[in-house]
């Protein structure tokens, strides 16, 4: 007999990054359907859903509403780091857990967040370590004007400098802004070897379109390779042919050319992971996340999350978009997350790096 538990879903169906949220939402709902149909598990999930509509000011109130007005203690959602940081105080207030299934910039370890996707040592560092010897050392950074863009550029600047490279430009625009003339003009003048694109949603699609136009000009048929740690298959349709040639890093790419990418797949896996952590353990859904992970490990399940920092071990895959599909260039075996980059320049340490404390 299955016991049914409420889980929250906090993902936007509209707004400037709707394609990302749409893929994640479908992944959550697929995971719920699979768990509910799995007779080897004694848990089933009932979805309590709220739509923030891509508006930052709605995330915290809607998170509070889910935790206050339902039995849900585990919420799947948030796309931007800004929205994740908005809900953490509500998770702390009500003892909830956010299952965060998208890449982020690191430098965080909350006992109320399950970081299921990749952090910089699992995406940005491997991507730059491939790009600098392969493409050249003249870099240009462009990003959305919030913590994701800022931190990705900061980490990348350190890595490029360590490789004796040059950062030719580091520019930011507001999330959703598509006024890119000044950035395209600067890229035209500087001719970087590669561009780290940390723009989100509509801003990214507009940038790729403008850059594709620049590449048609004389003298720009080579170089200007775009690198990304957050562009997946779920955005190919929105970006169109302008994204061709983009090189992305992440833990998973569609093997058969699907459209969900890692945003869909990691969201789906996250639902399964929670179900396995709760299987055979009535009442465990109210445990603190670190205790839930540690106790599940003691009962024979090998959790995806590291109990010391609540980040998942993930492979690092580098792939290039060609003819609308990502083709793998390089793959690293699953890497333990190092959210504070204590090993980023080669220091070796096999023991726990970080303990989550309240």
Where are these regions (language model features)?
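Extracytoplasmic "Venus flytrap"
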Residues: 4, 8-29, 50-54
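Beta-alpha junction/loop-to-helix N-cap segments that form part of ligand/metal-binding clefts
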Residues: 24, 39-106
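Short beta-strand elements in bilobed, periplasmic/extracellular small-molecule ligand-binding domains
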Residues: 38-54, 110-112, 160-177
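Periplasmic-binding protein-like
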Residues: 69-79, 99-101, 140-141, 191-207, ...
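Extracellular glycoside hydrolase catalytic/binding regions
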Residues: 96-126
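An alpha-beta-alpha
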Residues: 116-171
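Extracellular/periplasmic periplasmic-binding protein-like sensory domains
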Residues: 211-282
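Segments of small-molecule ligand-sensing domains
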Residues: 275-350, 356-357
